[in-house]
Amino acid sequence: MNAFVTVGSTQFDDLIRAVLKPEFQHCLVKHGINQLIVQYGKGKQAFGDPKSVAGLTILGFDYAPEIESYIHDASIVISHAGAGSILQTLRSGKRLLVVPNESLMDNHQVELATKLASMNYLVTCSTSNLVEGLEELYPKILTPFPKSDCSTFQKVMQDVAR
């Protein structure tokens, strides 16, 4: 089983560093994850030459023409709170842990993640409590996101924009 991490097109070094910490890697292995795939965007330096704990392989890349196949193949997705990444993952039916990039200016990522978490579609956390976020995600029964109806997501976006 694998976990897929995406930071989108922005730089989110804090998330990259957080998923590479041994305590987070041990938590992944504990939950049966044996491969961590990291789309690090502009964070190549933060990704560096990662050291993995026993039982876990780490792969990384900057960008791909599409990430749908990575999401499809993942057991869980750990994502920045970009609307596109969230919607794509929710539509795939994958378990989603969202980590807003709180360093962005005029950032609605926190509001979007919080609203969708309150609707039980995903779990959200910060980079400082990523292990706790993962531990919350695993036993939680999430509400399936409506497959063909975008009105729920549009409503959330309208609420966040207000």
UniProtKB/Swiss-Prot annotation:
Subunit field text: Heterodimer with alg14 to form a functional enzyme.
GO cellular component, one term: UDP-N-acetylglucosamine transferase complex
Catalyzed reaction equations: an N-acetyl-alpha-D-glucosaminyl-diphospho-di-trans,poly-cis-dolichol + UDP-N-acetyl-alpha-D-glucosamine = an N,N'-diacetylchitobiosyl-diphospho-di-trans,poly-cis-dolichol + UDP + H(+)
Main location: endoplasmic reticulum
Function: Involved in protein N-glycosylation. Essential for the second step of the dolichol-linked oligosaccharide pathway.
Compartment annotation: Endoplasmic reticulum
UniProt entry keywords in alphabetical sequence: Endoplasmic reticulum, Glycosyltransferase, Transferase
GO molecular function: N-acetylglucosaminyldiphosphodolichol N-acetylglucosaminyltransferase activity
EC number: 2.4.1.141
Gene3D superfamilies listed in its UniProt record: Glycogen Phosphorylase B
Gene that this sequence comes from: alg13
BP GO annotations: dolichol-linked oligosaccharide biosynthetic process
The UniProt record lists the keyword Lyase: no
Name under which the protein is recorded: UDP-N-acetylglucosamine transferase subunit alg13
Recorded family membership: Belongs to the glycosyltransferase 28 family.
Keyword 4Fe-4S (UniProt): no
